[in-house]
Regions:
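PLP-dependent aminotransferase-like
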Residues: 1-27, 84
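ALDH superfamily catalytic-core signature
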Residues: 11, 44-170
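Short beta-strand(s) of the beta-wing in winged-helix/HTH DNA-binding folds
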Residues: 17, 37, 168-170
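Beta-loop-alpha module in the N-terminal Rossmann-like domain of NAD(P)-dependent dehydrogenases
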Residues: 22-29, 43-50
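Well-formed, non-transmembrane alpha-helical positions, independent of function
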Residues: 29-30, 161
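Acidic-histidine catalytic/liganding microenvironments
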Residues: 33
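Periplasmic-binding protein-like
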Residues: 38-42
Length: 170
């Protein structure tokens, strides 16, 4: 991969290992290999549980960061801050969703105190409207397509669940 080409010669052999493939083939092979000294995994709880079982069977130390993404919470005192701070708070919320959920610390939702909902979300939506969607090969594109139809369908199902539970999709 490009990353390996860029930094491969800067690191001692074995420090950077890029393994491509799906979890069942690539991940499970790593989690059961006697050549692996330690496993660090970030991802879903079911997959993390499976990796920990595989690692335990082979007595491989492991560290996991699993699911349970937390909300970003905004209280009314934020609106008493300088405009630049409010803008950065709105930008932070947008950037949290910008990575498409691929970071364990990204928020899964925002909780905004009702008294500031309208003005704060107006600021957030200004930021959202600046996002250029399109072909991921276009250097001006900020958000491209989902990795697969399966991932796209999963996202739509979460939106549907949220709406059924009373969430508003903006």
């Amino acid at each position: 991969t490009l990353l390996a080409e860029l930094v491969g010669d800067l690191l001692p052999p074995g420090v950077l290992n890029i393994v491509q493939g799906f979890g069942r083939e690539a991940g499970e092979a790593l989690a059961t290999s006697k050549r692996i000294a330690k496993i660090a995994f970030t991802g879903s709880t079911p997959v993390g549980s499976h990796i920990m079982r595989c690692a335990a069977e082979n007595i491989i130390p492991s560290t996991v960061e699993l699911g349970g993404k937390s909300p970003n919470i905004y209280f009314e005192d934020i609106m008493q801050a300088e405009p630049a701070f409010i803008e950065k708070a709105a930008e932070g919320l947008v950037l949290g969703f910008f990575n498409q959920g691929e970071v364990c610390t990204c928020p899964s939702r925002a909780l905004v105190q009702e008294s500031i909902y309208e003005p704060f979300m107006a600021e957030v939506m200004k930021k959202v409207k600046q996002i250029k969607r399109g072909n991921p090969l276009d250097t001006d594109t900020m958000v491209g397509a989902q990795a697969s139809q399966q991932q796209f369908d999963k996202i739509l199902s979460y939106l549907e669940i949220g709406q059924q539970e009373g969430a508003q999709v903006l």
